C-alpha cells in the first residue's frame, strides 16, 4: 500500500479580503478607479473603548497600532490552532483548538478571562441561532 500524502496545516490565518479596484465611468467620460477597500477592526475597537471609557478618544496612529495588535493576536491563535489540529490529525479547527491555542499563547489570568469570554460569546451565538 502506498504511503499517504501528508496534509500541511495552513501556515497563517486567511488574508483579509481586498477587492480589486473597480473602474467606474465618471461624468466627463474618463475612467476613474475607486479606492480599494481595506478591512479593519477600527469600528469594533472604538465601540469597546466607548463601553469602557465613554469620555476618551483615540488617535489615528493609536487605532492603527490597536488594529495591528488584533491582527497579530488573531494570526498567532489561528497558527497555533492549525498546528494543534495537525497534531491530532484533524482537518478542521474547532472551538476546542481555538480554546487550547488561547491557553498556550496568552499568559495566566489573561488566558482565563479570554477563555471565559469566548465561551460566553459562543454560547450566546449558539442560543441566538436556534
From Swiss-Prot:
<comment type="function">
    <text>Core component of nucleosome. Nucleosomes wrap and compact DNA into chromatin, limiting DNA accessibility to the cellular machineries which require DNA as a template. Histones thereby play a central role in transcription regulation, DNA repair, DNA replication and chromosomal stability. DNA accessibility is regulated via a complex set of post-translational modifications of histones, also called histone code, and nucleosome remodeling.</text>
</comment>
<keyword id="KW-0007">Acetylation</keyword>
<dbReference type="InterPro" id="IPR007125">
    <property type="entry name" value="Histone_H2A/H2B/H3"/>
</dbReference>
<keyword id="KW-0158">Chromosome</keyword>
<keyword id="KW-0539">Nucleus</keyword>
<dbReference type="GO" id="GO:0000786">
    <property type="term" value="C:nucleosome"/>
</dbReference>
<feature type="modified residue" description="N6-acetyllysine; alternate">
    <location>
        <position position="8"/>
    </location>
</feature>
<keyword id="KW-0544">Nucleosome core</keyword>
<feature type="modified residue" description="Phosphoserine">
    <location>
        <position position="11"/>
    </location>
</feature>
<feature type="compositionally biased region" description="Basic and acidic residues">
    <location>
        <begin position="1"/>
        <end position="19"/>
    </location>
</feature>
<dbReference type="InterPro" id="IPR009072">
    <property type="entry name" value="Histone-fold"/>
</dbReference>
<feature type="modified residue" description="N6-acetyllysine; alternate">
    <location>
        <position position="17"/>
    </location>
</feature>
<feature type="modified residue" description="N6-acetyllysine">
    <location>
        <position position="12"/>
    </location>
</feature>
<keyword id="KW-0238">DNA-binding</keyword>
<feature type="cross-link" description="Glycyl lysine isopeptide (Lys-Gly) (interchain with G-Cter in SUMO); alternate">
    <location>
        <position position="7"/>
    </location>
</feature>
<protein>
    <recommendedName>
        <fullName>Histone H2B.2</fullName>
    </recommendedName>
</protein>
<feature type="cross-link" description="Glycyl lysine isopeptide (Lys-Gly) (interchain with G-Cter in SUMO); alternate">
    <location>
        <position position="17"/>
    </location>
</feature>
<dbReference type="Pfam" id="PF00125">
    <property type="entry name" value="Histone"/>
</dbReference>
<keyword id="KW-0832">Ubl conjugation</keyword>
<dbReference type="GO" id="GO:0030527">
    <property type="term" value="F:structural constituent of chromatin"/>
</dbReference>
<dbReference type="GO" id="GO:0005634">
    <property type="term" value="C:nucleus"/>
</dbReference>
<keyword id="KW-1017">Isopeptide bond</keyword>
<feature type="region of interest" description="Disordered">
    <location>
        <begin position="1"/>
        <end position="38"/>
    </location>
</feature>
<keyword id="KW-0597">Phosphoprotein</keyword>
<dbReference type="InterPro" id="IPR055333">
    <property type="entry name" value="HISTONE_H2B_site"/>
</dbReference>
<feature type="cross-link" description="Glycyl lysine isopeptide (Lys-Gly) (interchain with G-Cter in ubiquitin)">
    <location>
        <position position="124"/>
    </location>
</feature>
<comment type="subunit">
    <text>The nucleosome is a histone octamer containing two molecules each of H2A, H2B, H3 and H4 assembled in one H3-H4 heterotetramer and two H2A-H2B heterodimers. The octamer wraps approximately 147 bp of DNA.</text>
</comment>
<feature type="cross-link" description="Glycyl lysine isopeptide (Lys-Gly) (interchain with G-Cter in SUMO)">
    <location>
        <position position="18"/>
    </location>
</feature>
<feature type="cross-link" description="Glycyl lysine isopeptide (Lys-Gly) (interchain with G-Cter in SUMO); alternate">
    <location>
        <position position="8"/>
    </location>
</feature>
<comment type="similarity">
    <text>Belongs to the histone H2B family.</text>
</comment>
<dbReference type="GO" id="GO:0046982">
    <property type="term" value="F:protein heterodimerization activity"/>
</dbReference>
<dbReference type="InterPro" id="IPR000558">
    <property type="entry name" value="Histone_H2B"/>
</dbReference>
<dbReference type="GO" id="GO:0003677">
    <property type="term" value="F:DNA binding"/>
</dbReference>
<feature type="modified residue" description="N6-acetyllysine; alternate">
    <location>
        <position position="7"/>
    </location>
</feature>
Amino acid at each position: 500500500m502506498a504511503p499517504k500524502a501528508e496534509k500541511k496545516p495552513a501556515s497563517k490565518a486567511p488574508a483579509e479580503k481586498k477587492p480589486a479596484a473597480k473602474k467606474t465611468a465618471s461624468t466627463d467620460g474618463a475612467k476613474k478607479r475607486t479606492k480599494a477597500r481595506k478591512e479593519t477592526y477600527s469600528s469594533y475597537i472604538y465601540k469597546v473603548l466607548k463601553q469602557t471609557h465613554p469620555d476618551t478618544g483615540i488617535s489615528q496612529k493609536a487605532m492603527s497600532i490597536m488594529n495591528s495588535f488584533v491582527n497579530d493576536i488573531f494570526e498567532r491563535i489561528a497558527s497555533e490552532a492549525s498546528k494543534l489540529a495537525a497534531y491530532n490529525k484533524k482537518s478542521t479547527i474547532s472551538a476546542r483548538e481555538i480554546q487550547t491555542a488561547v491557553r498556550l499563547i496568552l499568559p495566566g489570568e489573561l488566558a482565563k478571562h479570554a477563555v471565559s469570554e469566548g465561551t460566553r460569546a459562543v454560547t450566546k451565538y449558539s442560543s441566538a441561532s436556534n
